[in-house]
């Protein structure tokens, strides 16, 4: 019998990202990151004049952070502590939008916190990567965890049998992000999230069909 599968994002689910990123761009690049939501659109502004950075300027900053500054990140409370208990009942994979080029860095980052799991660095919507993981693992039941609503929609469309948990572990942005209508639950506390995940694994049934949104 195949084991259940838990597919989790990393940034703002397992590890804090926007706060250490904001501190870094402020100190090293003279840029203020106004944390209003999980989007980077118009969030980065030059300290000296307040003008927003263009998209072409934002992505090199993100790339630089993930290449050299991931050591600044620190775990979301309760997240990594929950992994051994969840891992006793399910395989765990980390699916991050950091891109393939940052995949090894993410593996090493998590290993420093004694969490060892397969990591997939993807781009764009996570629906297709989740669908491929479902084909690869053939799990008895699967749970997907992410902080971004768009990824829940993508997974709902590409892999509707997967349970979807919307979790925003960063308090600075959690109350600014509305619950995704494509997720089965919104829980931002890992103690409660662990109970919800373990309950889905114990039930061992596919996610129900989604009501029209």
Question: Predicted regions span which residues?
Answer:
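Active-site neighborhood of HAD-like aspartate-dependent phosphohydrolases
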Residues: 1-58
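Short, basic/glycine-rich phosphate-binding loops at helix/coil junctions
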Residues: 50-66, 106-114
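Short, acidic loop-to-helix structural element flanking the phosphoryl-transfer center
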Residues: 64-94, 101-107
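Acidic, Mg2+-coordinating phosphoryl-transfer loop and its flanking beta/alpha structural elements
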Residues: 144-188
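Substrate-recognition "cap/lid" segment bordering the active-site pocket of phosphatases
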Residues: 99-143, 150-157
